[in-house]
Amino acid sequence: MNILITGHEGFIGQNLGAYLQSKGHNVEGFEWKPNIIPDPEPYDRVIHLGAISSTTERDVEKIMEQNYEFSMRLLQLCDQKGTTFMYASSASVYGDKFEENAKLQPQNGYAWSKYLFDRFVMQVPEFMINVQGFRFFNVYGPGEEHKGDQQSVFGKFEKQAKETGVIKVFEGSDKIDRDFIHVGDVCEIIEKFIDVDNTDIWNVGTGTPRSFMDIAKLYAKKYNAKIEEIPMPENLKGQYQYYTCSHNKKLINSIGVHNFRTIEEYVNASKT
């Protein structure tokens, strides 16, 4: 298939592009530019990953322009051209319930932009194309180094362990549980959905949350590092998800049971 990936230079985009090409698909990429919408007509699928993904971004107009308004215009153009639209939503739209039909409680500008676009998708029943949204949980894996402070705790903890011998975690990290999913699993799941003939939004996570402390201990053991607990910054407390866990009933119904990678496999396989 001919596939366009927006945000193809990002963490998930780079991994997905390489994976789809390895499966025989023709993949091209697009990065956001002001007032430019790519033409979807030459493509069988548009996979829209491009977004401001920083949960600490404060420029709401900038977030809405790129994450909501651009997404809406691109979707409408795909509908006109007959190109299936697949896009990245986020588990950050959830509160303390994680079924796809649960009450949504976004806590920051990024999460609000994803929530509003999800709502737009589900409130417009007259699309002529399939529109598929994926609420990614906490994605980790190779290629996220460029994200800096926004990379997952895997990258942060490993860097600290290797460079300083001390891994800094927030106080109470043994009770901060997240549903971490390897980017390789995300790529495989998206490819499976290429053949799914349906419009909906699905959770994409493992369904098995692990604590920040679990990950810190794995890296501490690997690099013989110490763990130091530090206070959580006040500006994060009100917008922090202390627990996430994907409910995968809809995912399983659509593509079957997926065999997820474990965090132990990833940590132990990485080079020292």
Residue spans of the language-model regions?
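Conserved Rossmann-fold NAD(P)-dependent oxidoreductase catalytic core, especially the SDR/UDP-sugar
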Residues: 72-109, 132
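NAD(P)-dependent short-chain dehydrogenase/reductase
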Residues: 109, 120-177, 183-187, 218-219
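SDR active-site strand-loop-helix element
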Residues: 6, 46-50, 85-91, 134-136
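NAD(P)H-binding glycine-rich loop region in Rossmannoid oxidoreductase-like domains
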Residues: 37-66, 77, 93-97
